Every structure is written in C-alpha cells, then in structure tokens.
A protein has these predicted regions:
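Helical segment within the ABC ATPase nucleotide-binding domain
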Residues: 197-210
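Short, glycine/charged-rich "phosphate-handling" switch motifs in NTP-dependent
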Residues: 230
Length: 237
C-alpha cells in the first residue's frame, strides 16, 4: 500500500499540423491517502485517463512530480512503479488461458536467467520438474481465482468467457501482482447494467479487503457516489 501525490503536474501535447499545442493537465495538485479508494470524475477529455497514464508511466509529464510512497517516480519506467492498471478493454491475451493471463505479470516481473526460463517453460508445458517459483505462481493464481470466482474457468480462453468474466480475469491479473496502487480506467463501461452493478460491488469488496490504494476513473455519477471514499472532480485539466 502507498500514498500517491501529484504535485503541480502538467501535461502538454505538442502542436500538430494546423493546430496549437494542447495542455491537458494544468498544474494538478492532488493527494491520495494510503489505502484510499479515490474516484476521478469529469467530462470526456478533461484529463482523467491522462492522469492515470502519467501515474502508470505510460506517458511522461511535461512538468511536475508523480510521487508514490514518498518517492518521485516521474522518471521511472512502468515496471518499477509498483502499480497495476485495469482497462476498459480488458486487454487479455487471446491465446493464453485464464490461468496464464492472471499469471502473466508474475512471470514477467524481474529478470530471469535462461536456465530459470527454460525450467519454468518445462513446468508449464509438461507439468513436471515444476520450479519453486512456478509453484508459488500457481498457488497465487489459484488464490486469486477463488477470490474472484474464476477457479472453474482457469483452463478456458478469453473467447469462451462472458464480458463480466473477462473483466474479473483482468482484475485478477492486477490483484495477483499485489501492487502498491491499483489504477482502473472505466473498467465497467463495456458491461450491461446488471453485470455492472454486480462487478461494482465486487470491486468495492475486494478493495476494502485488500486495502490497496486505488484510483478509479468513471463518467458514471452512481459509480462515483457508491464506490469511493472520496471523489475528485476534474474539469478542463
């Protein structure tokens, strides 16, 4: 868990042919407490998603600082920021099973020697000579799957899942890494009303259970009022 702070954060996109430069964020000062669920609301184009992308390291700020757990991470690559992001589009790997999608971030973390890579590959493809590391990953995947009611779906591919199940897999992939911060960018937009309500309650329950600092972007006022500890309204940067 970690506190998050944006200090005089600005983001400007350079001019394109025939148009001027666009300043999307105009000196944001915002603090998110450790373990807090903060909801960002505002009209389309106001900079909500850009703020998350700056925190995740997917874009660089033009000016200002992004601080996580008291450390300025503005110049760090995404892999060193200890954040996990859930997108509106699920972003699942279609050729990987539910289990492998959940485990993907765990297997990608850190640098492994060739021998360890080969051993893990043998373990996944044959089921024997399972390395201690691969065993820990399998146990973590099972734990997360049970938490999200996905244990009976671990062998399925994304194309065999409903929209709600896909979103739970995306959540599982983020949870499995045990990050310091969760970032959620309109994760329920593609779901129908009933699934949206069910998944909304599940996200809130998981966040309270895990206690992970969470920034959640939505344009839905009902989501904002029912999910967050606090709401931050963003308008025109």
């Amino acid at each position: 868990m970690a506190e998050v702070a944006f200090r005089q954060l600005r983001k400007q996109y350079p001019p394109r042919r025939g148009s001027a430069a666009v300043e999307v964020l105009k000196g944001i000062d915002l603090e998110v407490r450790d373990g807090e669920f903060l909801v960002l609301v505002g009209p389309s184009g106001c900079g909500k998603s850009t703020l998350l992308r700056l925190l995740a390291g997917l874009e660089a700020p033009s000016q200002g600082q992004v601080v996580v757990a008291g450390r300025d991470v503005s110049a760090l690559p995404p892999s060193r920021r200890d954040v996990a992001m859930v997108f509106q589009s699920y972003a699942l790997y279609p050729h990987l099973s539910v289990a492998d999608n959940i485990a993907f971030g765990l297997r990608r973390s850190g640098h492994r020697r060739l021998q360890q890579q080969l051993q893990d590959w043998v373990a996944r493809t044959t089921g024997w000579l399972r390395s201690p590391r691969e065993q820990r990953i399998a146990e973590r995947v099972q734990q997360v799957a049970e938490m999200l009611d996905l244990a009976h779906l671990l062998d399925r591919l994304p194309k065999e899942l409903s929209g709600g199940q896909k979103q739970r897999v995306a959540l599982g992939r983020a949870i499995a890494r045990q990050p310091a911060v969760f970032l959620m960018d309109e994760p329920l937009s593609n779901l129908d009303a009933k699934l949206r309500g069910d998944t909304r309650r599940q996200i809130v329950q998981l966040q309270r259970q895990l206690g992970v600092t969470t920034l959640y972007v939505t344009h839905d006022q009902v989501e904002a009022m029912t999910m967050g500890h606090r709401i931050a309204v963003l308008n025109a940067g």
